[in-house]
Amino acid sequence: MSGRLGELLVRENLISVQQLRKAQEEQQKNGTRIGTALVKTGAIEESKLTDFLSKQYGVPAINLKDFDVEPDIIKLVPKEVAEKHLVVPVNRAGPSLIVAMCDPSNIFAVDDLKFLTGYNIETVVASEVSIREAIERYYAEKGPSLEDIVGDVGDDIEVTKEETENIDEMAKAADDAPVVKLVNLILMDAIKKRASDIHVEPYEKDFRVRFRIDGVMYEVMRPPMKLRNAITSRLKIMASLDISERRLPQDGRIKIKMGGGKEMDFRVSVCPTLFGEKVVMRLLDKSNLQLDMTKLGFDAQPLAWFKEAIDRPYGMVLVTGPTGSGKTTTLYSALSSLNGLDTNICTAEDPVEFNFAGINQVQMHDDIGLNFAAALRSFLRQDPDIIMIGEIRDFETAEIGVKAALTGHLVLSTLHTNDAPGTVSRLLNMGIEPFLVTASLNLILAQRLARRLCPACKKPAENVDEQALIDAGVPPDKIGTFTMYEKVGCRDCNDRGYRGRVAIYEVMPFWDGLKELVINGASAAELKQEAIRLGMSSLRMSGLRKMMDGATTLEEVVGNTAPDRF
């Protein structure tokens, strides 16, 4: 609600538009919250603002100046957490901890407090000014640190020279119960918040943990520098990596079992940086893997084209897009629909993200010479019906894949290109002859992922910029025939306004008209123009349809797709 607070106060005639603008200038100048800026500029009294917030959030309001919080209560919340989330614990009530917050809708803060304290969290609202004053007052002498929560792991763990490191001590610290508890907290919190990646990042004077949620990075924690090596070592031990090797990148995998028997995999990448090892973990939740093609977000005609292309006994189907655009999900859904007792499927992947019964999956190992090209050559002696190559990276892999597609095999793979027509140019630039490209390709699919508007709180847009719609590519005659929605923010979406992502597809069957253009040396722009004439919807066109259907916003479409220019 923070972004709309000023507008709500104006609407309730508690402040004027001029006062809001003055406060916004103060906010931009000093980086404070809008509520604090309004109080500082004299637009509204602190007590009136707190009462207003209480009504908006539906929670009681308190004046922290009237409270004398017991030290035992203060110790429950580390100073770092109090300052990060602007919270102050005020009392206990049975299994619940009552916490004063200036933004009770901050689900991240509530979750962190619940994890760290073990209490159910009941929120009350207080102004930011009073919370900052309370933090300064209660934590002035010696506030509790996060180390008090996770325990002391020993001063000798932090070292300055690699040659003096004690590996036995590092391993021991990594297995200490407090460190194990903190690492488990990070992993479980990422699962609960539906993160796709966890970043554990060391810097010269700082150490932070960030989650990527719906494609956007969010900071969630700043553990003490003292625990940096212990946390990294714990993650490396869980991933069966060598904790004594800190100069080279390492890759591994973590598998954990949660309540109810559910298992979760984490793909782990460790990379040495200037101030220590950075750990990135990709969450691999097979239960959330969508393998039903009809539920991936295809429109009816593109879905029919895609199904027809993968149902052919031979030829090549390519899925393109940047990292994190959902290519693996699309390929896995295709393999799932093709997997049967009468089919031999071989895949070369780097890495293998999910295991599938009935599919022969091979993990690449470049260090011993097992790359995509080597795996492909081996597959051709394995009597395959369908071959999936994780990525076409070079001429050798492309050449073998094309030849396999021309000799009775269905080949599925990915490339990193901006759109479907651009994939043809990439293959030609790799050195594949035009006649081989036209003879082997069945279909090219380009895709992106845009954030989906939260269905629980999205609302019709009050002000629609018609010129912005036209500039984005919406036909003028379509303006006013659909309802545009805008993000709001609620507990369901952690006050972000978005929840999950929606796929945007550009499906280009390799029609005869396109083959003729390729043979004649046409450019990617000419290919795209002809494909659209033949019925293809570009990424921008598909994205705008998702917007007109109310699934996402114009900002997401424009940010994830390029305009169609010929």
From Swiss-Prot:
Disruption phenotype: Deletion mutants show complete loss of T4P-dependent motility since they did not assemble T4P. PilB and PilT double mutant also lack T4P-dependent motility. SUPFAM superfamilies: EspE N-terminal domain-like (SSF160246), P-loop containing nucleoside triphosphate hydrolases (SSF52540). The ATP-binding site is essential for assembly of pili. ATP binds at G321, P322, T323, G324, S325, G326, K327, T328. It comes from Myxococcus xanthus (strain DK1622). This is Type IV pilus assembly ATPase PilB. PANTHER family: PROTEIN TRANSPORT PROTEIN HOFB HOMOLOG, TYPE II SECRETION SYSTEM PROTEIN GSPE-RELATED. The keyword Protein biosynthesis does not apply. Belongs to the GSP E family. PROSITE patterns: T2SP_E. One of its GO terms (biological process) is pilus assembly. ATPase component of the type IV pilus (T4P) that plays a role in surface and host cell adhesion, colonization, biofilm maturation, virulence, and twitching, a form of surface-associated motility facilitated by cycles of extension, adhesion, and retraction of T4P fibers. Acts as a molecular motor to provide the energy that is required for biogenesis of the pilus and the extrusion of substrates generated in the cytoplasm. PilB ATPase activity is also essential for T4P extension while antagonist PilT ATPase activity is required for T4P retraction. It is found in: Cytoplasm. Pfam families: MshEN, T2SSE. SMART domains: AAA. Keywords: ATP-binding, Cytoplasm, Metal-binding, Nucleotide-binding, Zinc. The gene is pilB. Homohexamer. Interacts with PilC. Interacts with PilM. Signal peptide: none annotated. GO terms for molecular function: ATP binding; ATP hydrolysis activity; metal ion binding. InterPro entries: AAA+_ATPase (IPR003593), ATPase_typ4_pilus-assembl_PilB (IPR013374), P-loop_NTPase (IPR027417), T2SS/T4SS_dom (IPR001482), T2SS_E_N_sf (IPR037257), T2SS_GspE_N (IPR007831). Gene3D superfamilies: 3.30.450.90, P-loop containing nucleotide triphosphate hydrolases (3.40.50.300), Type II secretion system, protein E, N-terminal domain (3.30.300.160). Zn(2+) binds at C454, C457, C490, C493. GO terms for cellular component: cytoplasm; plasma membrane.
